[in-house]
Curated annotation (Swiss-Prot):
Belongs to the ribose 5-phosphate isomerase family. Keywords: Isomerase. NCBIfam families: PRK00702.1 (NF001924), rpiA (TIGR00021). Pathway: Carbohydrate degradation; pentose phosphate pathway; D-ribose 5-phosphate from D-ribulose 5-phosphate (non-oxidative stage): step 1/1. InterPro entries: NagB/RpiA_transferase-like, Ribose-5P_isomerase, Ribose5P_isomerase_typA_subgr, Ribose5P_isomerase_type_A. The active site is at E104 (proton acceptor). This is Ribose-5-phosphate isomerase A. The keyword Isomerase applies. PANTHER family: RIBOSE-5-PHOSPHATE ISOMERASE 3, CHLOROPLASTIC-RELATED.
Length: 223
């Protein structure tokens, strides 16, 4: 599967042209995209500026010699390539399994062409089998946890090595084990209006193209 993920990442990189501002995604498949951009910068003289979606991707891009700018310094991103944890037939998706959902959504929002690279296991009929990440400020997070629990959302604080996971932006993540999300847009609206929620992992209708790596090769889905 790694070879297919690599092929998907390399294929996505073909959408990147000289002079572009490029959003560099986070995750196991997006990793190969960033590697390919780095190779083209070094070997082909590709001239691009990258905007990263996590500290991990920043380190990777710097190591490859990709010039970077902060999201604060740009108004439009030409193309962003990132991964996803689930994608439904309406091009709604869940992201944030790696904990970078806030920065990923900040980079996705001003992007003209937003591309996801995934393996075929990520294609689902209905979102929700993958736990929905919700990034929350630490202050009041226990109360927010109880609110989610009272709604039957089966929340859990994300942990790493026995401690609470802290995002690159210094927040906690509460994962919601919803099993099935019947109305992603309604849930996104609810979470958008919940005080203490910084961002959530529902990316509804944002993506233009999904490059799928499967056992029979690549499939490119477009809106």
């Amino acid at each position: 599967m790694d070879e297919l993920k690599k092929l998907a990442g390399v294929t996505a990189a073909k959408y990147v042209k000289n002079g572009m501002i490029v959003g560099l995604g986070t995750g196991s498949t997006a990793y190969f995209f960033v590697e390919e951009i780095g190779r083209r910068v070094k070997e082909e003289g590709l001239q691009v500026v990258g905007v990263t979606t996590s500290n991990r991707t920043t380190e990777q891009a710097r190591g490859l010699g990709i010039p970077l700018k902060s999201a604060d310094d740009i108004d439009v991103i030409d193309v962003t390539v990132d991964g996803a944890d689930e994608v439904d037939p309406d091009f709604n998706g869940i992201k944030g399994g790696g904990g970078a959902l806030l920065m990923e959504k900040i980079v996705a929002t001003p992007t003209k062409e937003y591309i996801w690279v995934v393996d075929e296991s990520k294609l689902v009929e209905t979102l929700g089998a993958f736990k929905l990440p919700v990034e929350v400020v630490r202050y009041g997070s226990e109360r927010l946890f109880r609110v989610f629990k009272s709604k039957g959302y089966c929340p859990s604080f994300r942990e790493t090595e026995g401690d609470r996971f802290i995002t690159d932006m210094g927040n906690y993540i509460i994962d919601l084990d919803l099993k099935k999300i019947e109305d992603p847009k309604q849930l996104a609206n609810e979470l958008d209006h919940t005080v203490g929620v910084v961002e959530h992992g529902l990316f509804n209708g944002m993506v233009n193209k999904v490059i799928v790596a499967g056992k029979n090769g690549l499939d490119i889905l477009e809106k």
